[in-house]
Regions:
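A solvent-exposed, acidic/Ser-Thr-rich amphipathic alpha-helical stretch
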Residues: 34-101, 105
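Short structured motifs
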Residues: 22, 85-93, 113-114, 126
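Generic short beta-strand segments
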Residues: 105-113
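A short, acidic/glycine-rich surface segment
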Residues: 112-117, 152-154
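Short consensus segments that form the blades of beta-propeller domains
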Residues: 81, 118-122
Length: 179
């Protein structure tokens, strides 16, 4: 189930719902294969929020901004001779009772080291991601995405975690489940 770009903590239960789908999404992004990534989503307005400097929250709320951020930040680092991978440290997935909606929460750490194997502390960060999935054409497709980045960008930075997950979940329940 692991790939070149995605590693699982030994504590992860590999039979958790949607783990395979989450790994596919991560793997396609880590490989910069955005067409493959887009084939597994029905979400052009995913949100990433993080607070790396001076309390200012940056929000990316569309796929193009997100791809630009990822390409600029991670792709440039891997092109400069660093080995890049994501470790999934914690995972939880659940399906709705009628099996039409599911969500997963992933806590991961991005790692970068020199390709020679020297541990080079350039960019590690923790990221909590919540994906909401629904069934489309008999397979799970990512429907809504939210990530909050926290952690260490190679220099001591204080992050303020401002998650919008409860708000997103409330909207989803109203729109998708009619509650």
């Amino acid at each position: 189930m692991e790939t070149k770009f995605v590693k699982l903590s030994k504590d992860i239960n590999k039979s958790e719902p949607l783990l395979k789908e989450c790994i596919e999404l991560f793997d396609s992004v880590e490989a910069y294969d955005y067409p493959r990534f887009r084939s597994n989503i029905n979400d052009i307005w995913g949100t990433v929020d993080f607070d790396p400097f001076n309390g200012k929250t940056i929000v990316m709320d569309n796929i193009k901004d997100w791809e630009k951020f990822y390409s600029n930040a991670i792709h440039q680092a891997s092109n400069s001779g660093l080995s890049v991978w994501l470790n999934i440290d914690r995972y939880n997935g659940e399906n709705s009772k009628d099996n039409t909606l599911a969500w997963s929460e992933v806590r991961g750490t991005q790692h970068m080291i020199e390709k020679s194997g020297n541990p080079l502390h350039i960019w590690t960060f923790a990221c909590t991601i919540v994906w909401y999935f629904d069934k489309t054409m008999n397979r799970w497709i990512e429907r809504r995405y939210h990530a909050s980045l926290q952690g260490d960008f190679g220099i001591p930075i204080s992050f303020k975690f401002r998650s919008k997950i409860p708000v997103i979940w409330s909207v989803l329940k109203n729109k998708l489940l009619g509650k």
